[in-house]
Amino acid sequence: MLPKEDPELKKCKHKCRDERQFDEQQRRDGKQICEEKARERQQEEGNSSEESYGKEQEENPYVFQDEHFESRVKTEEGRVQVLENFTKRSRLLSGIENFRLAILEANPHTFISPAHFDAELVLFVAKGRATITMVREEKRESFNVEHGDIIRIPAGTPVYMINRDENEKLFIVKILQPVSAPGHFEAFYGAGGEDPESFYRAFSWEVLEAALKVRREQLEKVFGEQSKGSIVKASREKIRALSQHEEGPPRIWPFGGESSGPINLLHKHPSQSNQFGRLYEAHPDDHKQLQDLDLMVSFANITKGSMAGPYYNSRATKISVVVEGEGFFEMACPHLSSSSGSYQKISARLRRGVVFVAPAGHPVAVIASQNNNLQVLCFEVNAHGNSRFPLAGKGNIVNEFERDAKELAFNLPSREVERIFKNQDQAFFFPGPNKQQEEGGRGGRAFE
């Protein structure tokens, strides 16, 4: 269907109609030519719009795609992908410069070699089942974890893990806060050989002989055998032993203490819930593991065709990782606008693995596609004292304004303003653009 008010089409038709020397057939042919030209022009404009959308995503410093990850570990049995520093493309995200994001992927029945990190780690099990073992002060603690579990790994703590599932891959999302070089972290492998290279190999043989009280030939054998990488296949017997064996007091979760053991985010009561979605939150005020990092972890499951927001955070910058599903997000940003005092719409398509960031104060909305639920894991930095301000639905900020303030701000009678902002009776999760149109009988698609 062509636009009703295409000025070029209207001008072309008038010209054909006014040409008196044309007979009726010629006028009809001329009209058809005008419409074909209008269609071509509309298609060109559409292609230009899509190119502009693609360019917008390329220049968007708030969105990170596959190409923004690098492989730190890659073996036949799994990999570790690390997101580039948040400030690599823009200083606009300098508030989270000392945080890094990584994703571990491991095949069924695999072993991830022992390592320690010069960073504080918080892990979220996005998929699968694992056993995570930490060595602390001459004792070992093991935790069986599953989908939805959050666990803290203190900086410098030796840690290793297994994917104890025989059929399902393991996916773990990690957020790291470096403690040595701001914005940079390293994994240090003690156990290993050539791949992963053991840090013991950096010392001279004389020093190692004296420290370990063994001969060089023995050292060369121990530190020269492993060459398969830091993620390797393990037998069923090894997996069974590492899932259950424990020295000292048993600490296999859920029998361990909450202060060091996992928190299952999805077992908590949702902080927001209706037919359009659910939000689960682990707040630092409620969980000791997250307090000193000033970090909140949340998980949103947005029903297909629905949306979360718009809203904004007062202090927290939200780092979001798409775990499952598809959709898109929109955010109002004053920093990328070409003129002062105005806002640019930041938007991007969302799919599994995409990372997007909403800084404090930036209004944002996240919309699920019509085909699948959209599941988003979020790490909120600077969470202490943060407030979430809704911009639509129950409790939205405009409804809290005084009547006179509404009239002065909008230059309209307050009843007209209230007719807009009091119409939505849901909170946080709402029907998305497509559902709204379907309910209104207007049809159309906002996103595919």
Curated annotation (Swiss-Prot):
One of its GO terms (molecular function) is copper ion binding. Expressed in seed (at protein level). Expressed in seed. Residues 1-66 are annotated as: Disordered. Residues 84-220, 263-418 form the Cupin type-1 domain. GO terms for cellular component: extraorganismal space. GO terms for biological process: protein hexamerization; protein homotrimerization. Residues 1-44 have a biased composition (Basic and acidic residues). This is Vicilin Cor a 11.0101. It comes from Corylus avellana. The lineage of its organism: Eukaryota, Viridiplantae, Streptophyta, Embryophyta, Tracheophyta.
